[in-house]
């Protein structure tokens, strides 16, 4: 999938809506982690590290030469608060919701994977970190 195309945009909208529909609270982010890993694997990170601090994961994109590392981080967990909206992608997990914006933040960070896959860093490495609660 080429970055910055309608297909790319549609994939990000779909990911964000899936994350929003199925929020998981602190220390129970297993399905969220798997969903993010499935998305990232399409964009061939040099290394995908799982089970960091529980359900956390990190995707590493290596540069062509040695250099500094840049880490971009987001959180995986939702809140133990029910959602009262009527949108089609509202939370399907009773009493849980991404009313904190973490679903959007995860999508933004995951959205860097296609860009990094298409254009690796010139030097150093970029780490996309998805942190559990």
Identify the function of each model-found stretch.
Residues 2-98, 107-123:
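Acidic/His- and Gly-rich active-site-bordering loop/insert found
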Residues 76-78, 129-133:
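Acidic, glycine-rich active-site loops and adjacent beta-strand->loop/helix elements
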Residues 125-127:
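Residues at or immediately flanking beta-strands
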């Amino acid at each position: 999938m080429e970055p910055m195309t309608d297909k790319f945009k549609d994939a990000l909208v779909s990911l964000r809506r899936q994350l929003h529909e199925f929020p998981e609270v602190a220390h129970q982010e297993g399905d969220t982690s798997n969903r993010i890993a499935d998305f990232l694997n399409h964009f061939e990170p040099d290394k995908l590290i799982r089970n960091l601090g529980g359900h956390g994961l990190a995707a590493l994109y290596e540069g062509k030469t040695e250099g500094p590392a840049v880490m971009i981080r987001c959180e995986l967990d939702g809140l133990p608060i029910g959602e009262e909206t009527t949108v089609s992608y509202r939370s399907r997990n009773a009493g849980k919701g991404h009313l904190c914006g973490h679903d959007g933040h995860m999508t933004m960070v995951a959205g860097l994977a296609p860009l990094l896959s298409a254009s690796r860093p010139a030097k150093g490495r970029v780490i996309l970190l998805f942190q559990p609660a």
